Amino acid sequence: MAATWYQVTCDVPAQLAETVADYLADLSGCGVCTENRDVDSFSPDDIPELAISQITCYFSLPCRIEQQLAQITGFLAALPGYIPAAPPRVSLLGEEDWASSWKAHFKPLAIGQRLLITPSWETGRQDEGRAVIVLDPGMAFGTGGHETTRLCLECLEGLLVPPPEQLEQIKILDLGTGSGILAIAAAKLGALQIDAVDIDPQAVIVAEENCALNKVADRISCSTTPLEQLGDGYRIILANILAEELVRMAPGIVSRMAPGGSLILSGILAEREALVRNGFDPFPLSFEASLAAGEWRCLHYRRLP
């Protein structure tokens, strides 16, 4: 089989993964694959393990791979906090190898106790007791691998445990739905009335497609409806967006909560948690919990009667 692609893999500290992935995507003109793992980068026993992300990109032939590697190496060396875990690795792939290689990075992901996110080519896997969400990687709107999404899903799972007849009455809002993953999870966990909104029309199209793929389109309404035009009485509101946006939207979010309802806020860096908590302090809310995953935080509030 004739080689048609160079595969380049870099190991970088997890906190730099997004920066490096964006750079490699721009440089290669193709998508990138990011895989998180723990690697002991040092031999002394008293030095802790570092969280490492393995980022893989692809260059189509013909190309001057030596020049590309020099650019990558120079970019990495200039990053603050970059500690080389291993030099970039290069291999040649044929067309069929490339098609299967990127898929190898994406496997079913179990979240919490009752959810399983799987790409479409892995749908044969069923975990007993888990609701299966089918989402393919590569979309720009989220597939569940990021800490912010996982925290939201774990918190949501803990809330959607009443008897089925009670779940049917729960009205849910997914604010900034992206791929629709949170709304789909809510439907898979038994909710029947879900509004999924996003300011990006393309995100709404993707969310609608994913709802149809997961056979929950009859439970979820996807739209670009602005927050101020939505109704109220939501028992659960999910918002996985930037901390500053959460604070700006706080009055509109809280006013749409039902008394006793839950609010799940994610997309919050640890250093921004105080900003968000201060922004929601003036409202009639009870702070329930702060969940942590790496540098990210997810906050759970309840609306006071």
UniProtKB/Swiss-Prot annotation:
<dbReference type="InterPro" id="IPR029063">
    <property type="entry name" value="SAM-dependent_MTases_sf"/>
</dbReference>
<feature type="binding site">
    <location>
        <position position="198"/>
    </location>
    <ligand>
        <name>S-adenosyl-L-methionine</name>
    </ligand>
</feature>
<keyword id="KW-0963">Cytoplasm</keyword>
<keyword id="KW-0808">Transferase</keyword>
<feature type="binding site">
    <location>
        <position position="176"/>
    </location>
    <ligand>
        <name>S-adenosyl-L-methionine</name>
    </ligand>
</feature>
<dbReference type="GO" id="GO:0005737">
    <property type="term" value="C:cytoplasm"/>
</dbReference>
<keyword id="KW-0489">Methyltransferase</keyword>
<comment type="function">
    <text>Methylates ribosomal protein L11.</text>
</comment>
<dbReference type="InterPro" id="IPR050078">
    <property type="entry name" value="Ribosomal_L11_MeTrfase_PrmA"/>
</dbReference>
<dbReference type="Pfam" id="PF06325">
    <property type="entry name" value="PrmA"/>
</dbReference>
<protein>
    <recommendedName>
        <fullName>Ribosomal protein L11 methyltransferase</fullName>
        <ecNumber>2.1.1.-</ecNumber>
    </recommendedName>
</protein>
<dbReference type="GO" id="GO:0016279">
    <property type="term" value="F:protein-lysine N-methyltransferase activity"/>
</dbReference>
<feature type="binding site">
    <location>
        <position position="149"/>
    </location>
    <ligand>
        <name>S-adenosyl-L-methionine</name>
    </ligand>
</feature>
<dbReference type="GO" id="GO:0032259">
    <property type="term" value="P:methylation"/>
</dbReference>
<comment type="similarity">
    <text>Belongs to the methyltransferase superfamily. PrmA family.</text>
</comment>
<feature type="binding site">
    <location>
        <position position="240"/>
    </location>
    <ligand>
        <name>S-adenosyl-L-methionine</name>
    </ligand>
</feature>
<keyword id="KW-0949">S-adenosyl-L-methionine</keyword>
<dbReference type="InterPro" id="IPR004498">
    <property type="entry name" value="Ribosomal_PrmA_MeTrfase"/>
</dbReference>
